[in-house]
Amino acid sequence: MEGISTSFEGKHGNIRYWLKAEMDKPWSFNHKTKKAFTVISPIDINKPEYQVSIEDGVEKTLCCWLCISGPISINARTDRRGYCPGESIAISADFENHSSRTIIPYATLHQTQTFFANGKSRVRGTKFTVLTGLPVAPGNRATWDAQLLKIPAVSPSIMNCCVIKVDYYVKVALHIPGSYNLSMHLPIVIGTVPYRPIDPPTYAETLTGAVDIRDEDDDQYGTMGDLTYTPMYTYVYDYRYKPPPAYSEVDPYPQASNPDVVASSRL
């Protein structure tokens, strides 16, 4: 992915764009002001690479001294790879509990910020929305069928900047009393062009809130105006999840403009 990077305000750095104006006043202090604005690098989640499902599985066996219980496992998948803020991630999963303990399934949306400078890197993680399921008793199994995890007003993924990278993943896990939780990560992309977009696009302020955009070049008295800034990103209001059509509902031989083509494909 190339082009200009999306605006971003992070813990250890930012990608910020602004305009600065200065009024020259002879024999007096100049008047200055600055205004930040949001730049959004397009990530169209309607592209085929963002429509594929992400799937994985994990398993562990609990041990306590000489006693070994049966395995605990997770097999989970998302309905696609790309989403926009305001949409929901449809998570389908199978949880199997052959242990002697009651376990609780849950899923969370995570953001990872990676900052690069002078050959080193620093990583900061943030957890957002949480989805919790019903307890699974020993010897039982549970199934999630397109359980929805809402995406709040977060920044898009940033993959085209050499100093800041922003990634997202869905953590699907089992809380296991008296042991380390069993978890797995399903990487996703947060985009800027919604799924099946409807014009005009809508936007929302990021949930991280406003930041002060003053820096060492802005003196305390000469720079005037509102010097706070809140990034705004694409946000889908009133999103409704629509499950994909069943295989029996899809015509394997769609109508073509040339009937001979359809006939030959059935031979």
Question: Language-model features: where?
Answer:
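C-terminal beta-sandwich interaction modules and adjacent acidic
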Residues: M1-L267
